[in-house]
Design a protein with these regions (language model features):
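N-terminal organellar transit peptides
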Residues: 1-83, 91-234
């Protein structure tokens, strides 16, 4: 369980198994969630990555979020399965990562006893299922019969499927993607432009004149003078 702040919006991280009590210090309990949720005010973001857990504990957390006065944005970055999917339904807006999954199924329990006890357990599970359908119905607007059918089949949904069925509202976008692409494109375009300009400049620039070297083509001056002197005294 973690709590963080992001641009003035409080951020809660619901990461782990949902339980009524914490045994291994990595479970999320209603008491822990309540302490963090009401430690401040304003809009919140709840990141969820949980395989589920106790449906009663999940119901308590779901109710807290539904009753919260601020805006609640749920972001699923990994898995929102079983009881965790119920909590996700409390979001004013539910967003999923492109790689995230959401799973819904029928509630399960362990019962010991005679046939009468088994029948009581079955009746209890039926009522628990109806209560879970309530949360799904409020969020999705799907019929109870369709939701019940999806739960019977243990339905796994990627982001697109969850949006199609109304369990999610959108896909999380990478805020860095557009900026990065712009920078890369600008860099690439600048590099090409600079390369072209360098070529044009190098071709259009006047070539430096080379100094002409005077190479002797005949007799040197000194030799000529010597010859003149020799003739003078003949």
């Amino acid at each position: 369980w973690e709590n963080g702040d992001e641009l003035g919006v409080r951020t809660l991280y619901l990461d782990g198994t949902i339980a009524d009590e914490s045994w291994w210090d990595d479970e999320i309990t209603p008491r822990m969630f309540k302490d963090e949720l009401f430690s401040g005010s304003g809009d919140i973001v709840v990141w969820i990555n949980s395989p589920g857990g106790d449906c009663v504990a999940a119901s308590q957390i779901y109710t807290m979020l539904m009753d919260y006065t601020g805006n609640v944005t749920v972001k699923i970055d990994g898995l929102a399965a079983s009881a965790a999917s119920v909590i996700a339904m409390a979001g004013t807006e539910v967003l999923m990562a492109p790689t995230a999954l959401l799973m819904i199924h029928n509630p399960m329990s362990v019962a010991i006893g005679d046939t009468e006890e088994m029948q009581k357990a079955i009746a209890m599970l039926d009522e628990v299922k109806e209560s879970i359908i309530n949360a799904y119905e409020i969020k999705t607007g799907q019929s109870r019969a369709k939701i019940s059918h999806l739960m019977d089949g243990e339905t796994w949904m990627n982001a697109n499927k969850a949006i199609e069925l109304g369990f999610a509202d959108g896909i999380l976008e990478d805020s860095k993607r557009g900026h990065t692409e712009d920078v890369v494109f600008a860099f690439s375009r600048r590099a090409v432009t600079n390369s072209l300009m360098n070529k044009l400049i190098s071709k259009s620039a006047p070539k430096p004149e080379q100094k002409k070297q005077n190479t002797p083509t005949g007799v040197s001056i000194e030799a000529a003078m010597q010859k003149l002197q020799a003739r003078k005294y003949i």
